Amino acid sequence: KWGFISDVQGNRTKWIILGMIILALGANLAALCIPLYSLNTTAATLLSILAYVLIGLGVGASGTSLLALLATHTAQRRRAAAATITWLMMIFGIALTATIVGKLLDPYSVQRLIKIVFGLTMLTILLTGVVTLNIERGLERVKKNTNQSQSFILGLKIIWSNSQTKRFTIFVFLSMTAYFMQELILEPYSGLVFSFTPGQSTSLSGMQNGGVFLGMLAVGIACTGFKFGALKNWVSAGCMGSCISLILIALAGQSPEIAPLVPLVFGLGFFNGMFAVAAIGSMMSLASQNNDKREEI
């Protein structure tokens, strides 16, 4: 719904900033719920659910508005590069934030965590406001649009009636579920089966993100710099490679003494990155292939 409103209003910046504010509220509420668990578990659980709902809403409002901004103002031939740069910055931000916050948290205490979350969220809101200031004033739309006003339900029906869009939406839902599934099991798996220490399992996650970084970079250079391969083919290759990597990681547990877990995890990250950046590029191309103003939907 928020994405549709930014479609109608044409003000992506406002929704990017508003999404970050809502995300910050959710993150701070989640941190404040931690000490509440020792006083009232039920209240803490309910507030935690609310906090993560706010986090999801904030990420959706800010993230989809940013992607729609890219789709609206980026030429077709540059969309793979735009998606690559955006996701590379995201991966870099995750790694940088985790490193800095991890050092600031030592020695750990709930009070220290709450202060760090508050400071970090205030900083991100400030940076978002600065970098998006007047950013849309000097931009031109790649395509002109004639559809300025329509109901959300009507817009959704029109988009969903497109069989290509419907198939792609279902595909993204299933593939992203698989994409994030490994986050729940990979680190415990490495500790229980391969006897990794917490520090080693954390490094394993960093290795995977390094693979993601290189996979994204490779697809961006191949598609934009060398005009090699269509985005849909890169999406398929990334999915198949990720599937094979997960199977090999599972089989490696049968011989944990000799199995090369770290290279396999790096390979999983590489194919994850290949899939992710190609899927985002395909999504932006699909969103702007018509002349109507429905990139956010």
Please describe what each predicted stretch is.
Residues 1-11, 105, 215-231:
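Helix-to-loop junctions at the C-terminal end of transmembrane segments
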Residues 80-105, 208:
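Glycine-rich segments within core transmembrane alpha-helices of 12-TM secondary carriers
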Residues 53, 160-182:
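Pair of pore-lining "gating" transmembrane helices in MFS-fold secondary transporters
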Residues 18-42, 239-256:
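C-terminal ends and interior cores of transmembrane alpha-helices
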Residues 232-279:
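C-terminal transmembrane helical hairpin of 12-TM major facilitator-type secondary transporters
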Residues 184-202:
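Short amphipathic helix-loop junctions that connect adjacent transmembrane helices
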Residues 138-169, 193:
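Juxtamembrane intracellular "pre-TM" segments in multi-pass secondary transporters
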Residues 201-226, 242-245:
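Transmembrane alpha-helices of Major Facilitator/SLC transporters
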